[in-house]
Swiss-Prot record:
Organism: Agelenopsis aperta
GO molecular function: calcium channel regulator activity; toxin activity
Main location: secreted
Stretches assigned to coiled coil: none
One annotated Gene Ontology cellular component of this protein: extracellular region
Keyword flag Disulfide bond: yes
Name assigned to this protein: Omega-agatoxin-Aa3c
One of the Pfam families matching this protein, by short name: Toxin_34
PROSITE patterns (alphabetical): OMEGA_AGA_II_III (PS60023)
UniProt KW Nuclease keyword: no
Domain comment in the entry: The presence of a 'disulfide through disulfide knot' structurally defines this protein as a knottin.
Length: 43
């Protein structure tokens, strides 16, 4: 299940890598444990 760069991701998987190399899921951490606003980005 590919996620394009800029697309939403769950913060747990490296799905962003399968559309282009060195992709990763970047999130904002709220209160140190809640992940929000996760997006696939270029590593």
């Amino acid at each position: 299940n590919c996620i394009d760069f800029g697309g939403d991701c769950d913060g747990e998987k490296d799905d962003c890598q399968c559309c282009x190399r060195n992709g990763y899921c970047s999130c904002y951490n709220l209160f140190g444990y809640l992940k929000r606003g996760c997006k696939x980005e270029v590593g």
